[in-house]
């Protein structure tokens, strides 16, 4: 990938470092502080606000990573809004944070909601953290930013 990546819930900056390793410019979106090594990177812009505040600017992007610590359904709603700024050929990686009870049902509900805006070519529950599911998303044509 090339171009601009958005890192939702970026602090302390793990995903931002990965994205920079692929040569992407990154807007790290989080009210919390970034690791100083990440913050000093000239290819990183730290937006110290919420994802919703940032998206109001309407800047289109090539990649979105969402690792926000919040209710999975709320995070999915935010990804629905983000479909409007993700370029048609773009991709998103999202981590669903699931409560311990009813994980399978909650994961299914979240993916059903995401499928309104995205194709879901891949989803995997991580072995080391059974309460998270990582999902790869591609925007459906009608939602993507042209």
Feature-to-residue mapping (PLM):
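Local beta-strand N-terminus motif with an aromatic residue
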Residues: 2, 60-61, 89
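Residues at the starts of beta-strands that form the adenosine-phosphate
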Residues: 4, 25, 91
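Redox-cofactor binding/interface segments in oxidoreductases and associated redox assembly factors
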Residues: 7, 65-66, 94
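Short glycine/serine/threonine-rich phosphate/pyrophosphate-binding segments
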Residues: 12-17, 73-77
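A generic alpha-to-beta junction signature in SAM-dependent methyltransferases
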Residues: 20, 64, 85-88
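S-adenosyl-L-methionine
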Residues: 25-66, 71-74
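C-terminal substrate-binding/active-site "lid" region of AdoMet-derived donor-dependent transferases
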Residues: 76-143
């Amino acid at each position: 990938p090339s171009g601009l990546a958005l890192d939702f819930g970026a602090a302390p900056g793990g995903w931002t470092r990965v994205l920079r390793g692929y040569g992407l410019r990154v807007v790290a979106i989080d009210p919390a502080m970034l690791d100083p090594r990440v913050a000093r990177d000239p290819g990183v812009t730290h937006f110290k606000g919420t994802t919703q505040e940032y998206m109001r600017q309407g800047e289109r992007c090539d990649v979105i990573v969402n690792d926000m610590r919040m209710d999975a359904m709320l995070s999915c709603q935010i990804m629905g809004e983000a479909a409007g700024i993700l370029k048609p050929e773009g991709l998103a990686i999202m981590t669903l944070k699931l409560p311990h009870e009813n994980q399978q049902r909650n994961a299914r509900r979240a993916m059903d909601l995401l499928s309104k805006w995205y194709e879901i070519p891949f989803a995997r529950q991580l072995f080391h953290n059974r309460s998270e599911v990582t999902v790869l998303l591609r925007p459906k044509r009608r939602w993507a930013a042209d």
